[in-house]
Amino acid sequence: MTTSRSKSEQKNVDPEEIAKFSALASRWWDPDGEFKPLHKINPVRLGFIENHTDGLFGKKVLDVGCGGGLLSEAMAERGAQVTGVDLAEQSLKVARLHALESGRQIDYQCIAIETLADQQPASFDVVTCLEMLEHVPDPKAIVKACAKALKPGGKIFFSTLNRNVKSWLLGIVAAEHVLGWVPKGTHQHQRFIKPSELLRMTDAAALEDIAINGLIFNPLKGFVLSEKDVDVNYIIALKKPES
């Protein structure tokens, strides 16, 4: 754990975002609470990750922006050696307590990914950074740091929201104001990231894209993957070249 951060790392933290998630920390593991959509989408995200890693058992995994540990615990249940990092200490306290109650061995750290990547470059078989990029001022720096922490030949996953009229209507108007799936103010549409923009960031980090799928809501099936519809939520799998 570190107690100090560089000026560049401090600039890549939005205090309002940290405060927002800290205030909701106690409700991370309530499947019917403010994080209900993440509980619903988590199995789909996990399946996508497992499919593109040939399983997680025995792999060293870094979960960036782990929050209360929903994905971290799910990956640990699959036999992964998980390190979860986040800058919302209240969320990490909840994650640690839940892991203890569940009997899961997960290394949760309150540390910036930029710092961790400097300390442990090329150390992880798999890196995940899901629903986090749209909450930071400089997502490109996060992508670069995640890639730095990944071993050559390792797999890396990002998920976020596309930026267009449809994502504004569904991701903000409907989800926050009409259906109440997530608290009002959870997202800022201007911070949503188009797939083409994310791919430019991953290209700059020397990552090779493998697959991109949309995460869409089906009234009958719940959240499902789509190879064609990336208009709102989407997830991307990439690989770090061997050399």
UniProtKB/Swiss-Prot annotation:
Family: Belongs to the methyltransferase superfamily. UbiG/COQ3 family.
Catalytic activity: a 3-demethylubiquinol + S-adenosyl-L-methionine = a ubiquinol + S-adenosyl-L-homocysteine + H(+); a 3-(all-trans-polyprenyl)benzene-1,2-diol + S-adenosyl-L-methionine = a 2-methoxy-6-(all-trans-polyprenyl)phenol + S-adenosyl-L-homocysteine + H(+)
First-level EC class: transferase
InterPro entries documented for this protein: Methyltransf_11 (IPR013216), SAM-dependent_MTases_sf (IPR029063), UbiG_MeTrfase (IPR010233)
GO molecular function: 2-polyprenyl-6-hydroxyphenol methylase activity; 3-demethylubiquinol 3-O-methyltransferase activity; polyprenyldihydroxybenzoate methyltransferase activity
HAMAP family xrefs: UbiG (MF_00472)
Record lineage: Bacteria, Pseudomonadati, Pseudomonadota, Gammaproteobacteria, Alteromonadales
Name of protein: Ubiquinone biosynthesis O-methyltransferase
Pathway annotation: Cofactor biosynthesis; ubiquinone biosynthesis
Organism: Idiomarina loihiensis (strain ATCC BAA-735 / DSM 15497 / L2-TR)
Role noted for this protein: O-methyltransferase that catalyzes the 2 O-methylation steps in the ubiquinone biosynthetic pathway.
